[in-house]
Structure formats: structure tokens, C-alpha cells
Amino acid sequence: MTAEEYRELGFAYVKEKNWTAALKALRESEKRFLEQSAAEQSTGSVPPQVLSALGLCMAMAENRIQEGVQYCQRAINDQAHEAQFYYHLGLVYLKAPNKKKALNSFYNGLKLNPSHARIRKQLHEMGVRKLPILSFLPRDHFLNKFFGQLIRSNTKQSLSH
């Protein structure tokens, strides 16, 4: 199999959350990409998509959190505009467990792709709420409650018409 075929196999295992099989396939992909770069004497080596997925799998399959973070960070350094890389990094931090860093990673991913479904789902599962209407006041302040209910009722009315 080629490096690309191992990469696709690894990605398929990641989608199934079969971390051990994904890690094995992605390690083989990484190895073959490195061999390919050496043979071609080129500077391009392992694609950042592989690095990011490898980092996630290292954390999930073998609890190698620090190494997982490093791989995810390398992917982000190579290609900082990919929300998926921040999603993977956030999952690694959740495994750590470091909820604060996980949230920062997820929010950075949402800045790049506000409609990233997996990040949104993860934040929802974590119980993250939207900011209060008047963010300079506490969430339970009566003005925040009043305006929140007012906006929510107006939204429901406009959706029903």
C-alpha cells in the first residue's frame, strides 16, 4: 500500500474511533511519506492532516498526551487555517484532562469555521453555553434574564410565523 492509501485507511479508522487501528495505519503512512521525501530529496514530508490525526490517535490509543499535543501543534504550525486540526487538539486536551485548553482549541477552530459540526457538537456535549446578552453583567442578573427571555420569545414567534 502507498502512503496515501494508509492515510485514507487511518482516517476511516479515526471516523470509527478505532484508535489503535488508526494509529497503526497512520504511523505506516507517516513512515512512507518520510521515505518518499528522502527518496525524492524534497523538503515536503508528512502532510499536516496525517500529523493531526496521529496526535489524536496517540492520545486516545496510548494515552501519550504530550506527544499527541506536539503532533497536533506541528499540524497547526504547518497549516493554521484548518479547523479540524484545532478540533483534534481540543480532543487531546480533553483526554489530558485540560478543559480550559480544550475550549480554547475548539473556539480557535470555530473562528476558522463557525459551522464546524463536530466542534459545535463537542461544545454542546461539554455544556458550554452562549455568552449572556449583557456580558458585563453576571448571567443571573435580572437584566440578562429579562433580555434573554425577550429575545428567545421573539425568536420563537418569528419562527412560528
Regions found by a protein language model. Give the residues of each.
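TPR/TPR-like (Sel1-like) alpha-helical repeat modules
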Residues: 27-31, 94-135, 141-148
